[in-house]
Curated annotation (Swiss-Prot):
Disulfide bonds: none annotated. Belongs to the TatC family. Keywords: Chloroplast, Membrane, Plastid, Protein transport, Thylakoid, Transit peptide, Translocation, Transmembrane, Transmembrane helix, Transport. This is Sec-independent protein translocase protein TATC, chloroplastic. The gene is TATC. Its main location: plastid.
């Protein structure tokens, strides 16, 4: 047995007698462990009490457990890790997925429009993405079929439509020429296409509404009817205004300006390019009140903000008239800028009536 083993097998008195100095380690270890035991004892005391209470409650039955109520717990210096692992204190209630933020009633109308509450949505059948794509394909097919049928019907009466659209300037002595072979044929195709699209637009609008309306809330469905009706009326009103006021004024300006200098012999294709673009651009520009009403309902712009920028609106109306009209004369631009400004002010008034 080695020296280490010999030391372990001898008593302290024997080792001391042999001249080996031995230090009493056990009392020293006890003294060193006294502070550690004294610190750990308070931490273990609540746990012992809790176990004793649980044992008493188990013996007395469920009634004693209910009567005892919550068990008292004392905090201890060594319970920091356990406290960190416990559940956090309850925070403010979460409403409508806002994570403690403002409720849905306090949020903007745009947020409500993008993320409506389930209570506002009607109880319609849910569809997958493939069902939506299939429905979209069917509605596009119906729209194309309706527009194609309208174009064929207009092509059957294309000559009558050409004579009807030539009426604003025929009284001024203007004659139309066919400058290339087939020019009149392609002109009739163009006129038939524009008129067929105009006649088929109600069906296109209906298919769009039928596709979109299942995803709208009840309030949005009530609001959709006036928007669609107002948009359709304003579009056809713009076309009527262009045919009766804007186009004759612009064409008469050109005829009178060239009177005495040149004879007015116009290309049939260039004339219908001018008249058709002017009519449809005027119809689209008459949608300004509809856009204002939509922005007001979404809460993006108020009526006071619309009226406060009237100076910029005047400049914008003139610029828009210059872009929308195919001619460069100032008379046509002013004739279109005036109604645009009036429509803008009317739209701001409508937004104010609705409480925005």
């Amino acid at each position: 047995m080695g020296s280490a083993g010999a030391l372990l097998w001898h008593t302290p008195q024997q080792l001391h007698g042999r001249g080996i100095l031995f230090r009493q380690s056990r009392p020293l270890l006890r003294q060193r462990n006294l502070p550690l035991i004294s610190l750990a004892a308070p931490a273990l005391e609540p746990e012992r009490r809790r176990r004793q209470c649980l044992r008493c409650a188990a013996v007395d039955g469920d009634g004693a457990l209910r009567e005892s109520g919550p068990l008292p717990q004392k905090e201890s210096p060594s319970s920091g890790i356990g406290a960190a692992l416990e559940d956090p204190p309850p925070g403010p209630p979460v409403e409508n997925g806002s994570f403690g933020g403002p409720s849905q009633e306090e949020q903007s109308a745009l947020y409500t429009f993008l993320y409506p509450s389930k209570d506002l949505l009607p109880d319609d059948k849910e569809m997958s993405i493939f069902d939506h794509l299939e429905e979209l394909r069917d509605r596009i097919f119906i729209s194309v079929l309706a527009v194609g049928a309208a174009i064929l019907g207009c092509f059957a009466f294309s000559k009558d439509l050409v004579i009807f659209l030539e009426a604003p300037v025929t009284a001024q002595g203007v004659r139309f020429l066919q400058l290339s072979p087939g020019e009149f044929f392609f002109t009739t195709l163009k006129v038939s296409g524009y008129c067929g699209l105009l006649l088929g637009s109600p069906i296109i609008l209906y298919e769009i509404i039928a596709f979109v309306i299942p995803g709208l809330t009840r309030d949005e469905r009530k609001f959709l009817g006036p928007i669609v009706l107002g948009s359709s009326v304003l579009f056809y009103l713009g076309i009527f205004f262009s045919y009766t006021v804007l186009s004759p004024a612009a064409l008469n300006f050109f005829v009178n300006y060239a009177d005495g200098a040149v004879e007015s012999l116009w290309s049939i294709d260039q004339y219908f390019e001018f008249i058709l673009v002017l009519m449809f651009s005027t119809g689209l520009s008459f949608q300004v009140p509809v856009i204002q009403l939509l922005l007001g309902q979404l809460g993006l712009v108020s009526s006071d903000q619309m009226l406060s920028i009237w100076r910029y609106v005047v400049v914008g109306a003139v610029v828009a008239a210059a872009v929308l009209t195919p001619s460069t004369d100032p008379l046509t631009q002013m004739l279109l800028a005036g109604p645009l400004l009036g429509l803008y002010l009317g739209g701001a008034w409508m937004v104010k009536i609705t409480g925005r």
